[in-house]
């Protein structure tokens, strides 16, 4: 009977071990609820890293810009690290949905179409789409002046969305040429490969400040005025609300205004 007593004791030890493992698994799985923002985890920011002054690579190769400074300050107040990840901007919705990035924070216009695929923060800056021409060009004065012209813009931008849905650009404009980023479009404009660029005023005027002798702006809005916001995955309401709270605090205490003054010379935030 000795062997029976040993077997019973061994089984008892095994059962205790299994019970302990089950309790540990229960405790681990219960530590993160649905909709959690994973406090402590780094926030991964998806961006187009050639979109000055909102987010771009500086001369030292580091990502910098207005939105970068905002994101760093927001993460600091949340007690979290922040990681900036350059993505193909035309695939931004897929990057967000897949979880490869937590937020889209890089001069992202709030549109009804995008609201179908993501949550947005409150708007924090207005943004017009305007026309940019080569220095000395005087025949292009407004949208209708683009008839018969080759017009450049960035793929997956608000400008592209507007022109794709506008019959004038489909029928009367000679060609709408699409680029991976606005900087490439401006370079082609400088070199005479296209006649005009339709794009974000904030980005274009920043580029103009560095190339004042080559690019000019036609100070007329093309399409409706839009607003910038931060994009979040549809199922990440918790992170959206946490970030919105610190943004509200940054507005109230003047931090957002100071960051704006650093990049634009004045406070242009909403």
Where do the model's predicted regions map?
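Flexible hinge/capping segments at coil-to-helix
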Residues: 28-32, 37, 134-151
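Acidic, polar ligand-binding/catalytic clefts
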Residues: 72, 81-145, 216, 221-222
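A ligand-binding cleft/hinge motif common to bilobed small-molecule-binding domains
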Residues: 108-116, 164-167, 188-191, 195-224
